[in-house]
Amino acid sequence: MSKSPVILHLRAETKPLEARAALTPSTTKQLLDAGFEIYVEESSQSTFDIKEYEAVGAKIVPEGSWKTAPKERIIFGLKELPENETFPLIHEHIQFAHCYKDQAGWQDVLKRFPQGNGILYDLEFLENDQGRRVAAFGFYAGFAGAAIGVLDWSFKQLNGNTKGTKGEGEGGELPGVTPYPNENELIKDVKIELEKALTKNGGQYPKCLVIGALGRCGSGAIDLFKKIGIPDDNIAKWDMAETAKGGPFQEIVDSDIFINCIYLSKPIPPFINKEILNNENRKLTTIVDVSADTTNPHNPIPVYEIATVFNEPTVEVKLDKGPKLSVCSIDHLPSLLPREASEFFAKDLMPSLLELPNRDTSPVWVRAKQLFDKHVARLDKE
């Protein structure tokens, strides 16, 4: 007797300016061809047109209809569900939930699953037999983060870098950014702003420091820097060997742009703190915390407290000395290039999705379920 087909329900993303999709039209077709049933919600913010899904044979349903969908559907999305919703979750969910690393409010996020006998397969923790993530947005997170870093540095060169309040001319923060249709358009815009800044400052390129340079995210940041023409000598590429001695690091203070791309898996000494930054001779004016462990008690960049958003991409670090310093801590940076990031991610995820009919025995899914059970058990204790 053959198994019933896996039924996936692609929910519409609700996070503001989240234009990515967990399934693309091309990966939807692959799954349909493999015998899956797929429902796709209409979405007001997806980079993909609903007609693209319809054309490959998906069933189109209204936005938000997953809440009343039959229990046998697996609800598939990317970002977390809205915080103001608290009803129990009855389905199996595949998504990034951000509740396994003691983030603020993790219990409230996680408890909804056992309350409804639902299951969470967290995309961040789908790992192969070697312990590596099967799919990640890291490359485009680093790429987009570096782009915003250069835009912010250029903005400061052009508009002055004195401290002030938002919107008061000099001292204002970087204006909002919106998703780009493709990588080339983003590169073009960043190059234009960089060239203006170089004209103003006598052709001095920024000194950039990337921590986590050997990973997906760091390689994305370095790729952006190279594609817009920043000389290789101006890009310091740090990884675990360089940070082994423990921070804070004066080398960050002496750079113009600092990009943090590490994956935080355990407590480490901070890379920087307000004491080392509060210096008249500081060069650093732009931090991009791609890792965005904003609410993690072990955040290695403990100089800001909010996650920024695309329409207000930076927040000022309050310091008494030195030039103005801003942090970008957007936690869904790949949305700046939603189509390419979605295709890249979905392609990597495809072999694991094709294993969903065997999720009770397939190692990737079994490990994800065991991790879910482990953290649910913590709910009772904490």
Curated annotation (Swiss-Prot):
Pathway given in the UniProt record: Amino-acid biosynthesis; L-lysine biosynthesis via AAA pathway; L-lysine from L-alpha-aminoadipate (fungal route): step 3/3
Stored Pfam families: AlaDh_PNT_N
Record's keyword annotation contains DNA damage: no
A GO molecular function held by the record: saccharopine dehydrogenase activity
Domain of life: Eukaryota
Amino-acid positions noted as binding NAD(+) in the UniProt annotation, renumbered to this chain: R132, G215, R216, D239, T243, Y263, V290, I330, D331, H332, L333
Keywords (A to Z) from UniProt: Amino-acid biosynthesis, Disulfide bond, Lysine biosynthesis, NAD, Oxidoreductase
Family annotation (CDD domains): SDH
Entry EC no(s): 1.5.1.7
Top EC class of this enzyme: oxidoreductase
Binding site for L-saccharopine: R20, K79, Q103, R133, F137, S291, A292, D293
Active site: K79 (proton acceptor), H98 (proton donor)
Disulfide links within the chain: C217-C261
Record-linked Gene3D superfamilies: NAD(P)-binding Rossmann-like Domain
GO biological process, one term: lysine biosynthetic process via aminoadipic acid
A GO cellular component entry from the record: cytoplasm
Catalytic activity from the UniProt record: L-saccharopine + NAD(+) + H2O = L-lysine + 2-oxoglutarate + NADH + H(+)
Record-linked SMART domains: AlaDh_PNT_C, AlaDh_PNT_N
Disulfide bond among keywords: yes
Subunit structure: Monomer.
Sequence similarity: Belongs to the AlaDH/PNT family.
Role description: Catalyzes the NAD(+)-dependent cleavage of saccharopine to L-lysine and 2-oxoglutarate, the final step in the alpha-aminoadipate (AAA) pathway for lysin biosynthesis.
Protein name: Saccharopine dehydrogenase [NAD(+), L-lysine-forming]
Taxonomic source organism: Candida albicans (strain SC5314 / ATCC MYA-2876) (Yeast)
Gene, per the UniProt record: LYS1
